[in-house]
């Protein structure tokens, strides 16, 4: 297939770039060129900022007929409207990367039909608005969109934590016996998915014909409390973590930017009902166990 990625070298997308290249697809990546060391060897790469499309880039995009376009970097409704204008009538399928952060607090397994939306975190609110634009374009213009909702996705070169942006700083905190902040009592249930597994599911979905207009959560079926996630770090590093439990609301009041992703997302119970995607991808649950995935991330950090 002839596939266009806008993005493709981030923590969620790099695995997909490498997997699709290995399967022989004709893959083109448009990135700003900040992480070219992550590019697969044989893909076509164009260095450009897709938010500022010049005449040459516009001609290249519109003069090619793409089987699939995946934009990893849509964060608001204006970007969604731009891509609809740019690609409608020129592609077979367009994949919008949304997020499971759009769901509010739900005390049962989450499936794609649930309409309880996150109104707290601006990131999630913007993704919801973009989703609505794409869904309307599918209904009114037959725009061939497929909406994918990944959860908290990590990879070999990232360390997933409850504090956004902490990353490898967590390993330093543990090794230096510093306090490690855990929101509330650490008992909220959370789901972490390795980017290799997201890539495998995306690859399968790209090959399917009759899924335009569909929405899929792409998340692991394994879930753990934040307390248990940090216990895995303890086991892997063979080092006791000096945890400090702090109410999420207190974190937010002290630091809005730090606390917003917690009160708007990471303090929720996020357990998923994956029955929809299991019906079309039989080996969906063959995912990397969290213990094994974090072992790979820690090895990379060393």
Explain the meaning of each model-derived region.
Residues 134-159:
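Conserved beta-loop-beta element that borders a ligand/cofactor-binding pocket
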Residues 195, 252-284:
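Conserved C-terminal active-site "lid" loop/helix of NAD(P)H-dependent oxidoreductases
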Residues 155, 182-188, 216-223, 232-235, ...:
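Glycine-rich Rossmann NAD(P)(H)-binding loop
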Residues 285-302:
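Amphipathic terminal alpha-helices
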Residues 60, 64-109, 125-136:
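NAD(P)-cofactor binding segment of oxidoreductase domains
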Residues 204-262:
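Mid/C-terminal beta-alpha module of Rossmann-like enzyme folds, strongest
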Residues 3-23:
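N-terminal Rossmann NAD(P)H-binding glycine-rich loop of SDR-like oxidoreductase domains
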Residues 162-171, 182-207, 213-214:
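Substrate-positioning beta->alpha
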């Amino acid at each position: 297939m002839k596939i266009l990625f806008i993005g493709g070298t981030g923590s969620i997308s790099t695995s997909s770039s490498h997997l699709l290249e290995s399967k022989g697809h004709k893959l083109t990546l448009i990135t700003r060129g900040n992480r070219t060391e992550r590019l697969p060897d044989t893909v076509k790469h164009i260095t450009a900022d897709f938010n500022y499309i010049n005449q040459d880039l516009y001609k290249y995009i519109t003069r090619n007929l793409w089987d699939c376009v995946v934009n990893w970097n849509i964060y608001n409704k204006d970007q969604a409207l731009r891509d609809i204008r740019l690609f409608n009538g020129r592609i077979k399928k367009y994949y919008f990367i949304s997020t499971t952060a759009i769901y509010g607090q739900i005390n049962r397994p989450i499936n794609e039909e649930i309409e309880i939306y996150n109104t707290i975190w601006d990131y999630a609110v913007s993704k919801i608005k973009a989703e609505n634009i794409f869904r309307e374009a599918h209904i009114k213009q037959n725009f061939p969109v497929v909406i994918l909702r990944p959860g908290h996705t990590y990879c070999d070169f990232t360390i997933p934590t409850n504090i956004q942006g902490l990353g490898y700083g967590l390993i330093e905190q543990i090794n230096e016996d510093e306090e490690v902040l855990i929101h509330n009592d650490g008992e909220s249930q959370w789901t972490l998915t390795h980017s290799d597994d997201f890539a495998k599911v995306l690859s399968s979905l790209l090959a399917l014909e009759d899924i335009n207009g569909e929405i899929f959560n792409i998340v692991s079926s394994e879930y753990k409390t934040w307390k248990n996630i940090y216990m895995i770090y303890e086991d892997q590093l063979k080092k006791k973590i000096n945890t400090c439990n702090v109410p999420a609301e207190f974190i937010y009041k002290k630091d809005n930017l730090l606390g917003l992703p917690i009160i708007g997302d990471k303090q929720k119970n996020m357990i998923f009902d994956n029955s929809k995607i299991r019906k079309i991808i039989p080996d969906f649950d063959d995912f990397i166990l969290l213990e094994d995935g974090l072992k790979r991330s820690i090895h990379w950090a060393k």
